[in-house]
């Protein structure tokens, strides 16, 4: 017996399950799709590489420009150090004479003569310099310094540190020199005053000797790095014959010492100093 038409059920086949990748089918086809992806990725890589190359080129140019500007500052550091080294024996001789004056004076100090240079009074004629390294400070501030080669970075960093130390020593020297100006007057000498004067004199002698050692080390380091000025430039700055007026461009202390028969050193003796900026075990002192 036939069933009614309404009872006839037609089985509809279920669609086959497709993987996630199969469900996604780009309209241009897979080959074209992956070609587009590769092109985009390559474009990004090339753009990044080009940007990095431009940045590297810019930093390289900044380093080259910085090196050119640094040479002037390095020359001044060498010249100031040479002046400090040459005049230290003269400074020490002046201080030794002051000490003898204190010891040999009776109850009243024999006053010492005062000198004046560029409106500055002094009892001890010694170099006075700014001891600055401004170009390197600027290169540190704008980030250029970090792109210098490691060995060069170490040398320039050491010079910068030495200049900061030299400024600190200069401040101490001026304080002691100012305190000793009292020796221009015939002051009463009791044991306490006599001891204070001798203490300040000997502190200044010790400070001067330490500065000479550091000055010679700086000169050696700069010379070994190939940045030392010529002998003619050094001799002209030291101005031993007094042909040029004392000031920022020429020393007046060397001529002062020489004209009074006070001892001076040879600026070239920095070559006798052993010095290196390498880390322990990485280099041999020269």
Q: Model-found features: residue ranges?
A:
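Long, hydrophobic alpha-helical segments that serve as membrane-spanning/inserting helices
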Residues: 2-31, 52-286
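Hydrophobic membrane-insertion alpha-helices, especially the h-region
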Residues: 36-50
């Amino acid at each position: 017996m036939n069933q009614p038409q309404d009872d006839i059920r037609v089985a509809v086949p279920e669609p086959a399950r497709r993987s996630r990748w199969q469900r996604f089918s780009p309209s241009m086809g897979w080959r074209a799709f992956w070609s587009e992806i590769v092109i985009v990725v390559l474009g990004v890589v090339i753009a990044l590489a080009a940007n990095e190359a431009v940045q590297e080129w810019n930093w390289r140019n900044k380093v080259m420009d910085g090196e050119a500007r640094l040479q002037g500052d390095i020359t001044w550091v060498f010249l100031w150090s040479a002046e400090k080294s040459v005049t230290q024996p003269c400074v020490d001789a002046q201080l030794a004479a002051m000490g003898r004056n204190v010891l040999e004076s009776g109850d009243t100090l024999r006053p010492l003569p005062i000198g004046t240079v560029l409106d500055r009074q002094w009892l001890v004629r010694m170099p006075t310099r700014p001891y600055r390294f401004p170009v390197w400070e600027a290169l540190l501030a704008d980030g250029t310094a970090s792109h210098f080669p490691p060995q060069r970075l170490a040398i320039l960093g050491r010079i910068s540190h030495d200049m900061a130390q030299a400024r600190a020593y200069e401040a101490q020297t001026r304080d002691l020199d100012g305190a000793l100006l009292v020796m221009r007057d015939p002051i009463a000498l009791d044991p306490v005053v006599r001891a204070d004067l001798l203490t300040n004199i000997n502190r200044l002698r010790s400070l001067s000797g330490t500065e000479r050692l550091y000055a010679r080390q700086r000169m050696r380091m700069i010379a070994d790095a190939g940045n030392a000025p010529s002998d003619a430039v050094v001799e002209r700055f030291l101005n031993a014959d007094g042909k040029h007026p004392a000031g920022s461009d020429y020393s007046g202390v060397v001529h002062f010492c020489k004209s009074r028969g006070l001892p001076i050193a040879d600026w070239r003796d920095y070559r006798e100093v052993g010095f290196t900026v390498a880390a322990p075990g990485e280099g041999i002192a020269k």
